[in-house]
């Protein structure tokens, strides 16, 4: 009887410890996104410093005239829509609905790819107007900030492809559902960053 009580007493702290132990996937995701947040904060700071210098010498305003705001708004809507489809995919993963996960993540991949292609076309148009990364301070700030963001979008699209490939090759598991959720966190983060960039570059200018 004493032994049983003793074992119960030992088991309770172990259960409490297990419950209090942080989820390493969640911790890793938070750390990674925090690093990304600091990276983009640096890009925003660089943009505003460049803007202040450009406004001081009068070269900034004339460069912003090349921006096609309605076009940028259209591809922004596409990217934001991809965040919605991504979340629908996560909901499907939580239900164990593999077909739904594949469908919504595939749509997300398509929308993300359209955004990247749309941004590449914008670059092509701006270069045609003489605005390149080497043409001015504004050009450098514009291409560096939007270019790094585009690279993150491409990385997100690749991550979605990897998740879909893993689902195709093996039985759907909780680990795969977790992977889908982690990728969605990254994608939502990238979308929020773009909204900030869009407001800064195309409206504040």
UniProtKB/Swiss-Prot annotation:
Transmembrane segments: 29-49, 73-93, 104-124, 144-164, 184-204
CDD domains xrefs: Heme_Cu_Oxidase_III_like
Entry keyword set: Cell membrane, Membrane, Translocase, Transmembrane, Transmembrane helix
EC number: 7.1.1.9
Listed GO CC annotations: plasma membrane
Topology of the protein relative to the lipid bilayer: Multi-pass membrane protein
PANTHER family: CYTOCHROME BO(3) UBIQUINOL OXIDASE SUBUNIT 3 (PTHR11403:SF2), CYTOCHROME C OXIDASE SUBUNIT III (PTHR11403)
Subunit-level organization: Associates with subunits I, II and IV to form cytochrome c oxidase.
Name of the protein described by the UniProt record: Cytochrome c oxidase subunit 3
Protein source organism: Corynebacterium efficiens (strain DSM 44549 / YS-314 / AJ 12310 / JCM 11189 / NBRC 100395)
Gene: ctaE
